[in-house]
């Protein structure tokens, strides 16, 4: 909880200290999974919802001509995966890991001949804190596969990178595709493999304030 409070404080201080900033809400639909564990595992579909602020790192004007931005973002994100090892015998094993996550993106709009385009790319570090964990697993599966999974403990805190591409068709709406890749272990007791989160998402951003002035 202290880590969540710290992240929220950083987010708010950044917003208050920024000049000419925009803010809005973001949502995504994604497929996520945990790499290196649960044998025949399949990605789990989920959603994410959050908010962002965005302010220019280069000179801007009333026409919103800046092409480089810093964009902190915080969101609630549903993760985990489904395991299907020997499905006819054990059924489907369901692992739910929900996170409060924060990304700090560097966002670049393509520009040619001093003309800002509608297409952009973004990338930045990501941190996440586990706020909900649920496990619906056949005890017989656990007994047979624990020696491979070593998944009795789930890390509360994680970090990684997030990157993507997008388009801004109007002054208020953006659509994007995003990939997140964790660098920290989801299951710290698993010394056989690097068990990390990954996610592929499509989503939209909606700006609540349209103008810079």
Predicted regions and their residues:
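Flexible, solvent-exposed loop segments that connect beta-strands
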Residues: 34-41, 78-98, 131-155, 185-195, ...
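Sec-dependent N-terminal signal peptides
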Residues: 4-14
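Positively charged n-region of N-terminal signal peptides that target proteins for export
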Residues: 1-4, 19
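Glycine- and aromatic-enriched membrane insertion/assembly motifs of diderm outer-membrane
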Residues: 22-24, 30-33, 40-92, 174
């Amino acid at each position: 909880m202290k880590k969540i409070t710290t992240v929220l404080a950083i987010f708010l201080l950044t917003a208050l200290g920024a000049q000419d900033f925009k803010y809005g809400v973001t949502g995504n639909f994604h497929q996520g999974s945990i790499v290196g564990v649960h044998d025949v595992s399949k990605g789990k579909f989920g959603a994410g919802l959050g908010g962002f602020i965005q302010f220019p790192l280069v000179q801007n004007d009333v026409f919103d001509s800046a092409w480089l931005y810093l964009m902190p973002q915080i969101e609630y994100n549903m993760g985990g995966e489904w395991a299907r090892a020997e499905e006819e015998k054990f059924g489907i094993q369901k692992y739910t890991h929900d996170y409060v996550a924060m990304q700090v993106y560097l966002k670049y709009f393509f520009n040619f001949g001093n003309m800002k385009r509608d297409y952009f790319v973004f990338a930045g570090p990501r941190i996440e804190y586990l706020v909900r964990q649920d496990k619906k697993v056949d005890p017989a599966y656990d007994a047979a596969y624990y020696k491979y999974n070593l998944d009795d403990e789930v890390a509360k805190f994680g970090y990684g990178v997030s990157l993507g591409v997008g388009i801004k068709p109007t002054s208020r709406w953006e659509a994007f595709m995003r990939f997140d890749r964790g660098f920290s272990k989801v299951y710290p007791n698993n010394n056989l493999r690097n068990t990390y989160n990954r996610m592929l998402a499509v989503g939209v951003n909606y700006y609540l304030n349209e103008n810079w002035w």
